[in-house]
Amino acid sequence: MSRSETLFANAQKHIPGGVNSPVRAFKSVGGTPLFFKHAEGAYVTDEDDKRYVDYVGSWGPMILGHSHPDVLDAVRNQLQHGLSYGAPTAMETEMADLVCSLVPSLEMVRMVSSGTEATMSAIRLARGFTGRDSIIKFEGCYHGHSDSLLVKAGSGALTQGVPSSAGVPAAFAKHTLTLPFNDIDAVEKMLAEVGQDVACIIVEPVAGNMNCVPPAPGFLEGLRSLCDKHGVVLIFDEVMTGFRVALGGAQAYYGVTPDLTTFGKIIGGGMPVGCFGGKRLIMERIAPLGPVYQAGTLSGNPLAMAAGLTTLRLISRPGFHAELTDYTTRLLDGLQQRADAAGIPFVTTQAGGMFGLYFSGADDIVTFEDVMASDAALFGRFFHLMLEGGVYLAPSAFEAGFTSIAHGEAELKLTLDAAERAFAKLK
């Protein structure tokens, strides 16, 4: 019995399902989840001392790779001064100034402790600003686990085969209108019917919780135009794409400006953190300036600010994102070539340093239906074969993968060699 198997059995005694986030349980791919004890650079090491090239990256934040020395030094330095104050710090202002300088649509920001808090707060703010109740989201897009957003959600909800969560009252969900991702005609029709009741449209500009589905040409631009027409607040959930697909996020990458944006993951450098921000006119509606209440004991935590500031400064160097994107492109090209050579139906998608892998005969992946039509069982087999080869992919056919600047030629070769062997065994 492996150490991970023993730990998983023990964990299930007092932790529901043995994990603290459902997708970690390997339900989608089968088998026992790996328990990790160390991470450095492009690698993670499990409790049985096996090392893997990591394409999960703690599900997105580790864009520099694990245990970057500058980030660790920043956290160690802050540790000498305390863990949390429950009061303002200079670093919070530094972070706000830096984030607003990197993302031009931001005029003001508020720090929180998670991506879920960020999206929940942004939606409350949009409702308070507009005086309207309804929101529009898209099938397969996951915006955290607040009640009103667990309607046809992505991420773990897809791997469990359920569209939403038990425990969410119908009254909470009735104001959540769900439309097909990448279908601008459906949005136009809905707003023509009920636009006067819609406070906001929230969207992952790249849907990263039903694997990785980039926006169709004109989709984000269409959302911007329709929101302007109907007085609806446009919210980009950039918890995943922020500072990853480009330094200015997906809004810079695709050239579309939202009214509000939510962030997480990279902005904390690996520490628990979230952030939302946008137009001053809207943000000034938040307490203590306005009537929309939002608060948090650990918001702006100094350890998270230290890690996040250091990370954002490091990724701001010229050429950083071009290098990250180039590695990701070469990785996907290599995987596609090896799948084609083995006669395996396989499609990849990419947005900067995030990617999707699909066992599908489709020409492209554009819709929720395209994602659901892919072969999740075959992905599960591929996942375990890649593990045997020393490569750790996301343990779900419905989660995006992530590269880091620590991934280099050695990791690329190891990954592609493992994939070549894996595809051969899938024939």
From Swiss-Prot:
Subcellular location(s) of the protein: Cytoplasm
Residues bearing PTM N6-(pyridoxal phosphate)lysine: 265
EC identifiers of the protein: 5.4.3.8
Pathway: Porphyrin-containing compound metabolism; protoporphyrin-IX biosynthesis; 5-aminolevulinate from L-glutamyl-tRNA(Glu): step 2/2
Signal peptide: none
GO cellular component: cytoplasm
Keywords, in A-Z order: Cytoplasm, Isomerase, Porphyrin biosynthesis, Pyridoxal phosphate
GO molecular function: glutamate-1-semialdehyde 2,1-aminomutase activity; pyridoxal phosphate binding; transaminase activity
Reactions mediated catalytically: (S)-4-amino-5-oxopentanoate = 5-aminolevulinate
GO biological process: protoporphyrinogen IX biosynthetic process
EC top class, as a word: isomerase
InterPro entries: 4pyrrol_synth_GluAld_NH2Trfase (IPR004639), Aminotrans_3 (IPR005814), Aminotrans_3_PPA_site (IPR049704), PyrdxlP-dep_Trfase (IPR015424), PyrdxlP-dep_Trfase_major (IPR015421), PyrdxlP-dep_Trfase_small (IPR015422)
UniProt-recorded name of the protein: Glutamate-1-semialdehyde 2,1-aminomutase
Subunit structure: Homodimer.
Cystines in this chain: none
Protein encoded by which gene: hemL
Cofactor dependency: pyridoxal 5'-phosphate
Family (UniProt): Belongs to the class-III pyridoxal-phosphate-dependent aminotransferase family. HemL subfamily.
Major location category of this protein: cytoplasm
